[in-house]
């Protein structure tokens, strides 16, 4: 694991890029670049920039959606660039383990069940991320992280990273006490100065209330946790505009709407026609802070509890 047992969640589309990942690595954590939605050359550029900005500190990885048609090409590209780890969610892939062995890259699947945790260990995972219903984006379960974490920790003999709902030091301590080796945080870093979210989008985070957090049906085939934007409301009502152009970016798609374009519009600040993924506890965050200050406060909170 990293010097500080915190992984910054890989948030697509283009919320977590080199600037955010390197800032997290510089503080001793693991910074993830969200590869989903990127072209291969763009990903190469981001990885190289993250390496340069992190000055060899911490670890730099990528997160990629298994459901993406370009999944294998993107993880191979990252492996060729000497990435430290590959985190994969929104589906389960056996291909990733062969890539990990070929390039000697750590493979970290996102799972939500004992069954997939055991399969991951058998196939050669270096660690697993266990994601509960509190997480942002695509969800693999409707069970709380605190419900599923202890059983998975007991079932495998490799590092288990807990994901879903953590925004402060107190949350991290609770998950570590349940047996986690580390904690993945997305929302807290989405609302950072280094996040690639637009200024308008960061403003939305700070204005959120608990009742603004909803779950929509994603065309990927999973539930997706998002802010109740006008677009999300249309999706909840089954009235989201169907795509007029299709890039065939997903292996399987219901074509309810274009998830890649909806997320991209949100990242650019289009709150009306964009889909804004969020964790269940984003509404608890009231400041946009530099990554360095986020780490300082978290460490201070953890030490005060210990």
Tell what function each PLM region has.
Residues 1-159:
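Active-site entrance/lid segments in N-terminal catalytic domains of soluble metabolic enzymes
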Residues 11, 165-166:
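Active-site metal-binding loops of divalent metal-dependent hydrolases
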Residues 135, 142-161, 167-306:
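Conserved active-site-proximal phosphate/metal-binding subdomains
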